[in-house]
Amino acid sequence: MKPIIIDVHSHLAPGVTTDLVISALNQGVVDAMVMFARNPSTDAEVLGLADALPGRVVVGLAFQQPDWMIQQPGVLKEIERKLETGRYHWLGEVILRHYGAPAIGAPPWDLGVDTDLFRGVLTLATRYDVPVTIHHELDDETREVFRNVLRDHTSAVVVWAHWCGRAAPDDAQEFLDEFPNLYCDLAASTLLTSFGSEKNPLFIDEDQWDPDWKDLIEAMPDRFLFGIDSVVAALFANYGKWLEDYQKMFALLSSDTRAQVMGGNAARLLPAEVVADLAQVAGTEVIGSVSSTTTEPIPALTIDCSLDEAGKRISCQAGGYQEGMKLTWTSTASSKTRGGDWYNFNVSEDLIGTEATVFLEECSRGVCRTAQVVVDLAGSG
């Protein structure tokens, strides 16, 4: 069976009817959509759509609504009230800094990232174990304040819309390296049509990725999510066309990367019962899932580290980890934290002749196991 495909960035908006969503799903290979209401559409309408299309719609709790956009102080209480129902499995799209998109009637916004309200959203996302998608443009003015807020909320799973706030690839990697719970969606609507300010595009033309972006996605395939950003009815009406364009570009990625980005990563961020419903209806296999009836023992989590000949760089490789689980590396000898199955860092001069402890944590939805190893630096230098 084919891997599950989840579009993590869709919007219920005026003119987006149940029949239009059905038509969009029938135009391509997408199995399910994460759906956020865009004013004047409401959360109640998204719940109704999910009830009408079981296993096809992941209910998002909407933020493109008046109470959030005017920063109403009581908005957090309403968000928590809805989360307590257990019906909402994603938050978004939280508008923070938005350059605006006149072609679709979207004005610019700059609500600020270091606010009690946004910090409250991250706290609720952590408390209720739901991912939160944010629209926040990365630029020199916002970089450090955003970093500092994330440092205060490292347990929140944040999906940074539009390829990490349309960051340059090296800037995106810097943030992804530091924050293991940070993901980026690749939603670009129509690939090459600009609805606002053009910045660091993913694609050079309709047949070619920006090479630096492609390299980063291949290097960190567990940190990117597929989405189209169907934000108006016209995009749903032409969903098959946009999906065909995306499929062509994603075919240029390795098969493992493609499977993770197109749905495997999103599935790991959702409750198991939700993923089971999606997979059952779509008749697909979820990447990284393990059958509950398996009798195969789970191998021990291991770390294999080596010191280069000059004694200045430690290189580590994970072993025994389960596919689809979240890996996080740390060390007493480095401030660098990263995800993935490998970990490299330089040895500072003041540590030569001592030792370094490397830690690896493997987690899925709050269940974790760890491994550690001590690297002797006595021979370094």
Predicted regions and their residues:
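Mid-to-C-terminal alpha-helical segments outside catalytic/metal-binding sites
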Residues: 1-4, 9, 19-23, 27-32, ...
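Active-site gating/metal-coordination segments in enzymes
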Residues: 40-131, 190-191
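Catalytic pocket-lining loop regions of alpha/beta-barrel enzymes
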Residues: 51, 55, 106-225, 277
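A short beta-strand segment in extracellular, disulfide-stabilized domains
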Residues: 311-320
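Short glycine/proline-centered coil/turn motifs in the loop regions
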Residues: 319-323, 334
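Surface-exposed, flexible coil segments in extracellular/virion-facing regions
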Residues: 330-346
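Solvent-exposed segments in extracellular or luminal domains encompassing
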Residues: 341-358
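Edge beta-strands of extracellular beta-sandwich domains
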Residues: 366-379
